Amino acid sequence: MIKLRKWSDSSDVDVAVLAEELEQLLLAVYEVSPWTADQVAEVLRSDVNSCALAEDKSRLVGFLVWQETDFEAEVLQIAVKKAYQGQGIASALFAQLPTDKEIFLEVRKSNQRAQAFYKKEKMVVIAERKAYYHDPVEDAIIMKREKDEG
Protein backbone atom coordinates (compact mmCIF):
# COMPACT_ATOMS: atom_id res chain seq x y z
CA MET A 1 0.00 0.00 0.00
CA ILE A 2 1.32 3.43 -0.96
CA LYS A 3 1.68 5.92 1.87
CA LEU A 4 2.20 9.63 1.45
CA ARG A 5 4.01 11.80 3.92
CA LYS A 6 5.41 15.28 3.99
CA TRP A 7 9.14 15.37 4.65
CA SER A 8 10.67 17.91 7.01
CA ASP A 9 14.10 18.49 8.56
CA SER A 10 12.77 16.93 11.75
CA SER A 11 11.98 13.68 9.91
CA ASP A 12 13.78 10.50 10.81
CA VAL A 13 15.63 10.48 7.46
CA ASP A 14 18.84 12.49 7.11
CA VAL A 15 18.83 15.18 4.38
CA ALA A 16 21.90 13.74 2.64
CA VAL A 17 20.44 10.23 2.62
CA LEU A 18 17.09 11.42 1.25
CA ALA A 19 18.83 13.62 -1.33
CA GLU A 20 20.76 10.61 -2.61
CA GLU A 21 17.54 8.55 -2.80
CA LEU A 22 15.75 11.32 -4.71
CA GLU A 23 18.64 11.69 -7.16
CA GLN A 24 18.60 7.92 -7.78
CA LEU A 25 14.85 7.99 -8.35
CA LEU A 26 15.27 10.86 -10.84
CA LEU A 27 17.97 8.88 -12.66
CA ALA A 28 15.70 5.83 -12.82
CA VAL A 29 12.78 7.84 -14.18
CA TYR A 30 14.50 10.31 -16.51
CA GLU A 31 17.81 8.50 -17.21
CA VAL A 32 19.59 11.81 -16.59
CA SER A 33 18.95 13.52 -13.28
CA PRO A 34 18.15 17.22 -13.59
CA TRP A 35 19.56 17.65 -10.07
CA THR A 36 22.63 16.31 -8.28
CA ALA A 37 22.32 14.95 -4.75
CA ASP A 38 23.93 18.16 -3.46
CA GLN A 39 21.36 20.28 -5.29
CA VAL A 40 18.53 18.13 -3.93
CA ALA A 41 19.90 18.53 -0.40
CA GLU A 42 20.09 22.31 -0.86
CA VAL A 43 16.48 22.40 -2.08
CA LEU A 44 15.32 20.26 0.86
CA ARG A 45 17.05 22.53 3.38
CA SER A 46 15.35 25.68 2.08
CA ASP A 47 12.56 27.03 4.27
CA VAL A 48 10.42 27.96 1.24
CA ASN A 49 10.45 24.45 -0.24
CA SER A 50 8.30 21.47 0.69
CA CYS A 51 8.59 17.80 -0.21
CA ALA A 52 5.94 15.08 -0.27
CA LEU A 53 7.09 11.45 -0.45
CA ALA A 54 5.25 8.38 -1.74
CA GLU A 55 6.45 5.14 -0.17
CA ASP A 56 5.65 1.47 -0.65
CA LYS A 57 6.63 -0.52 2.44
CA SER A 58 9.01 2.30 3.45
CA ARG A 59 10.67 2.31 0.00
CA LEU A 60 10.61 5.58 -1.89
CA VAL A 61 8.56 5.28 -5.10
CA GLY A 62 7.77 8.92 -5.84
CA PHE A 63 8.09 12.48 -4.67
CA LEU A 64 7.02 16.05 -5.31
CA VAL A 65 9.02 19.15 -4.40
CA TRP A 66 7.52 22.62 -4.54
CA GLN A 67 8.44 26.16 -3.57
CA GLU A 68 5.87 28.29 -1.82
CA THR A 69 5.43 32.03 -1.32
CA ASP A 70 2.54 33.95 0.22
CA PHE A 71 0.51 33.93 -3.01
CA GLU A 72 1.77 31.11 -5.23
CA ALA A 73 3.60 27.81 -5.40
CA GLU A 74 5.87 26.38 -8.07
CA VAL A 75 6.36 22.68 -8.73
CA LEU A 76 10.12 22.17 -8.86
CA GLN A 77 10.19 18.43 -9.45
CA ILE A 78 7.87 15.43 -9.54
CA ALA A 79 8.80 11.84 -10.26
CA VAL A 80 7.26 8.39 -9.79
CA LYS A 81 9.20 5.17 -10.42
CA LYS A 82 8.22 3.64 -13.75
CA ALA A 83 6.89 0.44 -12.14
CA TYR A 84 4.46 2.57 -10.10
CA GLN A 85 3.29 4.95 -12.83
CA GLY A 86 -0.37 4.84 -13.82
CA GLN A 87 -1.52 4.00 -10.28
CA GLY A 88 -2.61 7.51 -9.23
CA ILE A 89 0.52 8.25 -7.20
CA ALA A 90 1.38 11.44 -9.10
CA SER A 91 -2.19 12.68 -8.60
CA ALA A 92 -1.99 11.88 -4.89
CA LEU A 93 1.29 13.79 -4.68
CA PHE A 94 -0.21 16.70 -6.63
CA ALA A 95 -3.07 16.78 -4.09
CA GLN A 96 -0.47 17.79 -1.48
CA LEU A 97 -0.04 21.17 -3.18
CA PRO A 98 -1.81 24.14 -1.58
CA THR A 99 -5.24 24.79 -3.06
CA ASP A 100 -5.44 28.40 -1.88
CA LYS A 101 -2.58 29.54 -4.15
CA GLU A 102 -1.85 29.67 -7.86
CA ILE A 103 0.40 26.77 -8.93
CA PHE A 104 3.04 27.13 -11.65
CA LEU A 105 5.41 24.68 -13.34
CA GLU A 106 7.62 24.22 -16.38
CA VAL A 107 7.63 21.07 -18.50
CA ARG A 108 9.62 20.05 -21.57
CA LYS A 109 7.73 20.84 -24.77
CA SER A 110 8.30 17.25 -25.95
CA ASN A 111 6.93 15.70 -22.75
CA GLN A 112 3.37 15.23 -23.96
CA ARG A 113 2.59 12.58 -21.33
CA ALA A 114 3.45 14.97 -18.49
CA GLN A 115 1.49 17.79 -20.12
CA ALA A 116 -1.57 15.55 -20.40
CA PHE A 117 -1.23 14.65 -16.71
CA TYR A 118 -0.91 18.31 -15.70
CA LYS A 119 -3.98 19.22 -17.76
CA LYS A 120 -5.86 16.49 -15.91
CA GLU A 121 -4.74 18.25 -12.73
CA LYS A 122 -6.38 21.48 -13.99
CA MET A 123 -3.17 23.12 -15.17
CA VAL A 124 -3.37 25.26 -18.32
CA VAL A 125 -0.65 26.42 -20.71
CA ILE A 126 0.13 30.11 -20.23
CA ALA A 127 3.48 30.63 -22.01
CA GLU A 128 6.57 29.10 -23.54
CA ARG A 129 10.24 29.67 -22.63
CA LYS A 130 12.72 29.22 -25.46
CA ALA A 131 15.77 27.03 -24.79
CA TYR A 132 14.91 26.71 -21.08
CA TYR A 133 16.18 23.15 -20.73
CA HIS A 134 19.70 21.93 -21.44
CA ASP A 135 21.08 18.50 -22.26
CA PRO A 136 19.33 18.51 -24.69
CA VAL A 137 18.33 22.11 -25.29
CA GLU A 138 14.56 22.36 -25.44
CA ASP A 139 11.76 24.86 -24.91
CA ALA A 140 9.65 24.78 -21.77
CA ILE A 141 5.90 25.01 -21.57
CA ILE A 142 4.78 27.08 -18.57
CA MET A 143 1.57 25.91 -16.97
CA LYS A 144 -0.62 27.36 -14.24
CA ARG A 145 -3.47 26.23 -12.02
CA GLU A 146 -5.70 28.87 -10.48
CA LYS A 147 -6.15 28.87 -6.73
CA ASP A 148 -9.09 26.91 -5.34
CA GLU A 149 -9.08 24.60 -8.39
CA GLY A 150 -7.01 21.80 -6.87
Where do the language-model regions lie?
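Residue-level detector of beta-propeller blades
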Residues: 60, 125-127
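Conserved active-site tyrosine of GNAT-family acetyltransferases
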Residues: 118, 123, 143
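Conserved hydrophobic beta-strand within the GNAT/NAT acetyltransferase core sheet
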Residues: 75, 103-107
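Conserved beta-strand positions that form and line the central face of beta-propeller blades
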Residues: 53, 65, 128-131, 142
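C-terminal "cap" of GNAT-fold acetyltransferases
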Residues: 3, 7, 108-112, 131-150
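Conserved acetyl-CoA-binding loop-helix of GNAT-fold acetyltransferases
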Residues: 80-99, 112-120
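Acetyl-CoA-dependent GNAT
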Residues: 2-13, 19-83, 91-96, 146-149
